[in-house]
């Protein structure tokens, strides 16, 4: 009964929102728009609660009225969650595809999700609209629709933008995006849209390296659908020959409005990465002081830390060496999180291996200091919760080195 009620409620809402007229019409339309029934729009959906919805979503809508009319969405954000999806995503081998289907099915999905949906009708000539539609149809063919997803440079937002720019360039025109006062790095953009998901941003900060800290151009900012919407709203189309300008967007509509942003609440401070890291640091200091006082070494604790750091190091080095994802090839976290961390987890139990363990801990201290120096010099930005974890590793390594030197290990 509740499902039926919800279904009919959504249908009623769609009946209202689909009948809404444009909230604003700013630009002067092209000369032949009134005689042509083909309309092309950029669709932008506000962020949702799932990880893959945090940045919002973009798609293309193409409509034609008349007896042969249609209302289609060209959606570049479709993927298959197969058994090996996680492995492929980690390797950077994730394939997305362009799906074409009735726009109403697309809209109802976001209505039920509670995400606001915007439509920006593009101010294109008849020839440009036809060329763009033809390009989208060719792209949607079975042999062309699959593409290698890149979350920064080739995603559901950059693809529609690029198709529009290509259609214009074929007709001797190009898009000029209005400049902005402030540009951000990729890491700053990810942190902004993932602000309520502290563990997600913490993991991204660990996994992605120095490239994420380069300042993105305004064009590169548009991998975020909401920023693409803003850029298109202020953009103009310039004719290469006459230098005549017109607005890229002729009308903006709000197809569905949600008063509640469907984003999860922030992580409680006591469950945040920083709180957990500080707790681990406090435990480490307590155990280390007890080791100093009793003259013994808590091998069990070093084993636990070593196993966790080893597994983290395996992931980091896999991303650095094997992954095709952007911003993974140069990562300073590889200095203090390495697969070699398994050594302090195992070697202290073998007396003859103590010199090797001391060698590892000595090198670890040097690498941690190098990591801190490079971060302080601005080579790479790191999450603040990393510092207590680095301190944990440093304290245990220094503890082992001093214990070995004083020959206090029993």
Segments predicted by a language model, with ranges:
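Glycine-rich catalytic cores of cysteine/serine-nucleophile enzymes that process amide/ester linkages
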Residues: 36-114
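Internal catalytic domains of large membrane-associated glycosyltransferases
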Residues: 12, 28, 35, 42, ...
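Membrane-proximal intrinsically disordered regions of secretory-pathway and membrane-system proteins
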Residues: 26-33, 250, 404
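A cross-kingdom signal targeting lumenal/periplasmic-facing segments of multi-pass membrane
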Residues: 78-170
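Activation targets extended, charge/polar-rich intrinsically disordered C-terminal tails
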Residues: 138-346, 352-357, 361, 365-410
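Alpha-helical membrane-anchoring segments
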Residues: 28-34, 51-53, 262-266
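A short, structured loop/turn motif at beta-sheet edges
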Residues: 31-35, 64-69, 123-128
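Bacterial Sec-dependent N-terminal signal peptides
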Residues: 1-30, 409-410
């Amino acid at each position: 009964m509740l499902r039926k009620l919800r279904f009919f409620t959504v249908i009623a809402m769609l009946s209202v929102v689909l009948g809404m007229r444009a909230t604003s019409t700013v630009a002067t339309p092209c000369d032949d728009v009134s005689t042509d029934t083909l309309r092309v729009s950029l669709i932008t959906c506000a962020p949702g609660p799932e990880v893959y919805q945090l940045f919002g979503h973009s798609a293309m809508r193409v409509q034609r009225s008349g007896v042969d009319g249609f209302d289609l969405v060209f959606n570049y954000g479709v993927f298959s969650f197969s058994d090996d999806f996680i492995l492929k995503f980690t390797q950077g081998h994730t394939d997305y595809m362009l799906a074409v289907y009735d726009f109403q099915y697309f809209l109802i999905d976001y209505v039920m999700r509670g995400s606001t949906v915007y439509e920006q009708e593009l101010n294109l000539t008849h020839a440009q609209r036809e060329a763009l539609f033809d390009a989208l149809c060719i792209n949607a063919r079975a042999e062309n629709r699959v593409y290698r997803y890149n979350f920064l440079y080739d995603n559901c937002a950059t693809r529609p933008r690029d198709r529009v720019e290509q259609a214009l360039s074929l007709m001797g025109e190009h898009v000029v995006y209005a400049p902005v006062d402030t540009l951000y790095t990729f890491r700053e953009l990810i942190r902004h849209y993932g602000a309520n998901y502290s563990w997600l941003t913490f993991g991204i900060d660990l996994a992605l390296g120095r490239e994420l800290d380069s300042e993105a151009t305004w064009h590169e900012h548009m991998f975020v659908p909401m920023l693409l919407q803003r850029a298109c709203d202020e953009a103009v189309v310039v004719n290469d020959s006459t230098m005549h300008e017109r607005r890229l967007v002729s009308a903006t509509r709000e197809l569905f409005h949600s008063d509640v942003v469907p984003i999860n609440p922030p992580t409680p401070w006591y469950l945040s990465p920083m709180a957990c890291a500080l707790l681990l640091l406090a435990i480490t200091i307590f155990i280390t002081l007890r080791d100093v006082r009793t003259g013994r070494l808590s091998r069990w604790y070093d084993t636990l830390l070593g196993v966790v750091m080893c597994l983290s190091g395996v992931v980091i080095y896999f991303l650095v060496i094997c992954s095709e994802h952007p911003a993974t090839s140069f990562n300073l976290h590889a200095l203090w999180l390495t697969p070699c961390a398994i050594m302090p987890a195992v070697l202290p139990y073998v007396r003859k291996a103590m010199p090797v363990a001391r060698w590892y801990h000595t090198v670890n201290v040097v690498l941690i200091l190098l990591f801190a120096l490079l971060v302080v010099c601005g080579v790479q930005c790191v999450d603040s919760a990393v510092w207590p974890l680095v301190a944990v590793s440093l304290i245990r390594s220094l503890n082992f080195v001093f214990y070995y030197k004083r020959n206090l290990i029993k």
